[in-house]
Amino acid sequence: MGLLSILRKLKSTPDQEVRILLLGLDNAGKTTLLKQLASEDISHITPTQGFNIKSVQSQGFKLNVWDIGGQRKIRPYWRNYFENTDILIYVIDSADRKRFEETGQELAELLDEEKLSGVPVLIFANKQDLLTAAPASEIAEGLNLHTIRDRVWQIQSCSALSGEGVQDGMNWVCKNVSTKKK
């Protein structure tokens, strides 16, 4: 097989593009998670004022990840990004217990959005490397995740800093893309 036929074969089987929306409160670790996925330097991260987009190849998919800032003043603009979302990844700071109620409210509002109806959701219980982090099971219970019936969902413990648990979550994403794709 010559080089040209190899290139033609590669071109004929392009990766399926997947639009992923990465949301969560400010300081939850969304950008760190995104940079970890893209194998980029995570030593200097500042709060996201608008949004970041990165494309990551994984298991035959081209994952186009939209990381939107989580500050309170930016959250009303989240809805501008809902259209054509294949997977929602919601990041929670597992160590910031004071904000569990706030993050739960934001997640509940997202799950009620018509444009996100039926979209599979992965909840990353981030910052598990911190001693004060609540386990994913406790967060799932506190946010009543077991009541979600209109979509597939998963909660995944992770540390965006160390990368632990991140790949497990992305494996789930790749497995569940097809449940939303028509």
Curated annotation (Swiss-Prot):
Which keywords label this protein? Answer: Cell cycle, Cell division, Cell projection, Cytoplasm, Cytoskeleton, Golgi apparatus, GTP-binding, Lipoprotein, Membrane, Myristate, Nucleotide-binding, Nucleus, Protein transport, Transport
Sites of N-myristoyl glycine lipid attachment are 2
Which PROSITE patterns did the record assign?
ARF
Tell me the GO molecular function terms.
GDP binding; GTP binding; GTPase activity; magnesium ion binding; microtubule binding
Task: Specify the domain of life of the species encoding this protein.
Answer: Eukaryota
Q: In what way does this protein cross or attach to the membrane?
A: Peripheral membrane protein
* Cellular location(s): Golgi apparatus membrane; Cytoplasm, Cytoskeleton, Spindle; Nucleus; Cytoplasm, Cytoskeleton, Microtubule organizing center, Centrosome
Where, by residue number, does GTP bind? 24-31, 67-71, 126-129
InterPro entries, per database record: ARL2/3 (IPR044612), P-loop_NTPase (IPR027417), Small_GTP-bd (IPR005225), Small_GTPase_ARF/SAR (IPR006689)
A Pfam family for this UniProt protein? Arf
Coarse class of the protein's main subcellular location: Golgi
Keyword tRNA-binding recorded? no
A GO biological-process term: small GTPase-mediated signal transduction
User: Known SMART domains for this protein?
Assistant: ARF, SAR
Q: Which GO terms describe its cellular component?
A: axoneme; centrosome; ciliary basal body; cilium; cytoplasmic microtubule; Golgi apparatus; Golgi membrane; midbody
Give the family this protein belongs to, as stated in its UniProt record: Belongs to the small GTPase superfamily. Arf family.
Q: What does this protein do?
A: Small GTP-binding protein which cycles between an inactive GDP-bound and an active GTP-bound form, and the rate of cycling is regulated by guanine nucleotide exchange factors (GEF) and GTPase-activating proteins (GAP). Required for normal cytokinesis and cilia signaling. Required for targeting proteins to the ciliary membrane by releasing myristoylated protein from unc119 cargo adapters into the cilium.
User: What is the protein name given in its UniProt record?
Assistant: ADP-ribosylation factor-like protein 3
The organism is: Taeniopygia guttata (Zebra finch)
Q: Which gene encodes it?
A: ARL3
